[in-house]
Amino acid sequence: MIKSELVQRIADRNPHLYLRDVEKIVNAILDEITRALSRGDRVELRGFGAFSVKRRDARLGRNPRTGAHVPVEEKSVPFFKTGKEMRERLNEGYLAE
């Protein structure tokens, strides 16, 4: 599912909301999660999961085309850990359509 599909599904389930308003809400939520992560904060959505940032150490990588070794700088990467309720629902097939 892509963001536009998510927006459409939410709008379909909430006919009292305009599509453009749902899109603004979804964008605002994603922006706030991104801002929190960029500050190094953890974002927890109970029953769904938690977003956090992990640091990857600098390392020596390899160019897959040439095989040459290349230095890869230290970087921050987003990390998502599913919540217990989400895992249970997925394992029960609850979300299958």
Curated annotation (Swiss-Prot):
It holds the Pfam family Bac_DNA_binding. Gene3D superfamilies: IHF-like DNA-binding proteins. One of its GO terms (cellular component) is cytosol. GO terms for biological process: DNA recombination; regulation of DNA-templated transcription; regulation of translation. InterPro entries: Hist_DNA-bd (IPR000119), Histone-like_DNA-bd_CS (IPR020816), IHF-like_DNA-bd_dom_sf (IPR010992), IHF_beta (IPR005685). Keywords: DNA recombination, DNA-binding, Transcription, Transcription regulation, Translation regulation. GO terms for molecular function: DNA binding; structural constituent of chromatin. Belongs to the bacterial histone-like protein family. Heterodimer of an alpha and a beta chain. This protein is one of the two subunits of integration host factor, a specific DNA-binding protein that functions in genetic recombination as well as in transcriptional and translational control. This is Integration host factor subunit beta. It comes from Beijerinckia indica subsp. indica (strain ATCC 9039 / DSM 1715 / NCIMB 8712).
